[in-house]
UniProtKB/Swiss-Prot annotation:
EC number: 2.7.8.31
Annotated protein name in UniProt: UDP-glucose:undecaprenyl-phosphate glucose-1-phosphate transferase
Gene that encodes the chain: gumD
Taxonomic classification: Bacteria, Pseudomonadati, Pseudomonadota, Gammaproteobacteria, Lysobacterales
NCBIfam families the UniProt entry points to: EPS_sugtrans, WcaJ_sugtrans
Disulfide bridge map: none
Main location as per UniProt: membrane
Length: 484
C-alpha cells in the first residue's frame, strides 16, 4: 500500500528523510477508512434488509462490537505493511483473512451471548459479503492509483548496490519493465566479484568503490542500499554494515543463489532468525496454492466425470471386447513427495508382466498394443480414468506427468533436479506435454527437456496457466502422433 509504504520506518530501520510529514497521517487515514468501510457496509446491509438507515439497539451493539474486533484483527494482520513489489493478490488474501477473522470473532461472540436471537442472520451474511467486496474494491482502486503514480515517477525509491552480480542484473531488468514497483536502481559500487563488463548488458553506472558509499549517501537522496556479494565474503559484508552504522538507511542483502538449483525460493523469519527457503513445493510455498489447486481439481474432475461417463462406459466395453483382461490398467507411479500411488488408465495393451525392473516404454508398432488400444493412446482417451485419481487426491488435472516407478530410479541418477518434479501432485496433462514432450522419450536430452518444462510449471504456477494448459491439451495433444 502507498500509505503504508510512505511510513516504512515504522517497521524497518530507514532514513529520516523517508519520513514525510504526511506519512503518519496517511497511515492513520487508511486505518480509519477501513474501519469506516466496515461500519458503512453494515448500515447499507441494514438499509437493504429493513428499509431504514437507523438500526435498532441490538444491531447498534453488533456494529459496535464488530468495529472493536476490526480494530484488533486489522492490527494483528500485516494489512498496513509495505506492499511495494508484491502482487495485488497477496495483499487481498491478507485482507480477506483479516476480515474473515473479524466475523469469526463476531460469530463466537454471538454464540456466547446469544445474539442470534436478536439479530437477523441474513443481515449478518449480507454485511460480511458487502464489507468484503467493498474493502477489496477499495484496495484494488488504491493499488491501481499507486501504480499509476509510480509509473509517472512519484513515490519512487532510489536504490544503490554494492557489487554487481547476476541477481542484481535480473532485478534491474525486472524494475525497468515494471515501473509500478516504484524502485529506481541508480547505480552500483564496484567490487572484485562483479560481472565482467561484457556480461552486464545494461547500462548501470558505476558510482565508485565501496569506500565512497557513505559520501555518496550524504550528498544524494537514496532510500535503500543493497549488498550483492558472494556468501563466502562474510567479513566484507560485516565491514559494509559497520560503515552504514553511521548512516541509518534500509539495507538489503541480495544473495547469489542461482547455482543452487532453486525452486520457489523465498525468505521468512522463524522466531528471530531469518531463513531462506531454497526449494519448496506449492504445499509449503503458499496456502493460496493449496486451496485454489484443490478446489480447481475437485470441481473440474466432477464436471468431467458428469460429462464423460457415457464415453467412459463405451470405452470400457471396447476394451473388454478388444482382448482378454481387465478394463483398467493399474501401475505404480511416484506422486507428491515421491510417495507411490496406483495410477489408472484404460488398458490399451494385451496383459503382460509389468513387475520386472526393465524400463520399457511403449514404442511405435509395439506388438503389445491392441488395435483399439492404439486408438485410445493416440487420442489420449486412455487417460480418462485418472479422473478417479484426481477425486481421490493422488493426482491433479494439471501437473508433471507421473513416470513409472522404474523410470524414477533410472533417471534420477542421470538428470539433475529430476526429483524436484515431485514437489507437486502429478497431473493428467502438463506443461511439457502441451509443448510437444509427450509419449516415448528415446533420448536422454528429450527427457531432460521434459523435466525442464515440469520445473518451469512449478515455478510459474497459476490458475490461468492451468486453464491455458487444459485448452492447449485439447488443441495440441489430442491425436498427437508422438503417442503410441
Amino acid at each position: 500500500m502507498l500509505l503504508a509504504d510512505l511510513s516504512s520506518a515504522t517497521y524497518t530501520t530507514s532514513s529520516p528523510r523517508l519520513l514525510s510529514k504526511y506519512s503518519a497521517a496517511a497511515d492513520l487515514v487508511l486505518r480509519v477508512f477501513d474501519l469506516t468501510m466496515v461500519v458503512a457496509s453494515g448500515l447499507i446491509a441494514y438499509r437493504i434488509v429493513f428499509g431504514t438507515w437507523v438500526p435498532a439497539a441490538p444491531y447498534r451493539v453488533a456494529i459496535a462490537t464488530t468495529l472493536l474486533y476490526s480494530v484488533i484483527c486489522f492490527a494483528l494482520f500485516p494489512l498496513y505493511r509495505s506492499w511495494r513489489g508484491r502482487g495485488l493478490l497477496s495483499e487481498l488474501v491478507v485482507l480477506g483473512g483479516a476480515f474473515g477473522g473479524v466475523f469469526a470473532l463476531f460469530a463466537v461472540h454471538a454464540l456466547i451471548v446469544q445474539v442470534g436471537e436478536q439479530v437477523s442472520r441474513g443481515w449478518v451474511g449480507l454485511w460480511f459479503v458487502g464489507g468484503l467486496v467493498s474493502l477489496v474494491a477499495a484496495r484494488t482502486l488504491l493499488r491501481g492509483f499507486l501504480n499509476h503514480l509510480r509509473t509517472q515517477g512519484v513515490d519512487v525509491q532510489r536504490v544503490v548496490v554494492v557489487g554487481l552480480r547476476h541477481p542484481v542484473m535480473k532485478i534491474s531488468h525486472y524494475l525497468s519493465r515494471n515501473p509500478w514497483v516504484g524502485m529506481n536502481m541508480v547505480g552500483y559500487f564496484r567490487t572484485p566479484y562483479d560481472l565482467a563488463v561484457a556480461e552486464q548488458r545494461q547500462g548501470l553506472p558505476c558510482l565508485g568503490d565501496p569506500d565512497e558509499l557513505i559520501e555518496y549517501l550524504k550528498n544524494n537522496q537514496v532510500e535503500q542500499v543493497w549488498i550483492s556479494l558472494p556468501l563466502g565474503e562474510r567479513d566484507h559484508i560485516k565491514q559494509l554494515l559497520q560503515r552504514l552504522d553511521r548512516y541509518p538507511i534500509n539495507v538489503k542483502l541480495v544473495p547469489d543463489l542461482f547455482d543452487f538449483g532453486l525452486l520457489n525460493q523465498s525468505a521468512e523469519q522463524i522466531g528471530s532468525v531469518p531463513v531462506i527457503n531454497l526449494r519448496q513445493g506449492g504445499v509449503d510455498r503458499d496456502n493460496y496454492f493449496v486451496v485454489a489447486k484443490a478446489l480447481q481439481d475437485k470441481i473440474l474432475a466432477v464436471i468431467a466425470l458428469m460429462g464423460l461417463w457415457p464415453l467412459m462406459l463405451a470405452i470400457a466395453v471396447g476394451v473388454k471386447m478388444s482382448s482378454p483382461g481387465p478394463v483398467f490398467f493399474r501401475q505404480r507411479r511416484h506422486g507428491l513427495g515421491g510417495r507411490e500411488f496406483y495410477m489408472f488408465k484404460f488398458r490399451s495393451m494385451r496383459v503382460h508382466d509389468d513387475h520386472g525392473t526393465t524400463i520399457q516404454q511403449a514404442t511405435k508398432n509395439d506388438t503389445r498394443i491392441t488395435r483399439f488400444g492404439s486408438f485410445l493412446r493416440r487420442s489420449s482417451l486412455d487417460e480418462l480414468p485418472q479422473i478417479f485419481n484426481v477425486l481421490g487426491g493422488s493426482m491433479s488435472i494439471v501437473g508433471p506427468r507421473p513416470h513409472a516407478a522404474q523410470h524414477n530410479t533410472h533417471y534420477e541418477k542421470l538428470i539433475n533436479h529430476y526429483m524436484q518434479r515431485h514437489y507437486v501432485k502429478p497431473g493428467i496433462t502438463g506443461w511439457a506435454q502441451v509443448n510437444g514432450f509427450r509419449g516415448e522419450t528415446p533420448e536422454l536430452r528429450t527427457m531432460k527437456k521434459r523435466i525442464q518444462y515440469d520445473l518451469d510449471y512449478i515455478r510459474r504456477w497459476s490458475l490461468w496457466l492451468d486453464i491455458r494448459i487444459i485448452v492447449l491439451t485439447a488443441v495440441r495433444v489430442l491425436g498427437q502422433k508422438t503417442a503410441y
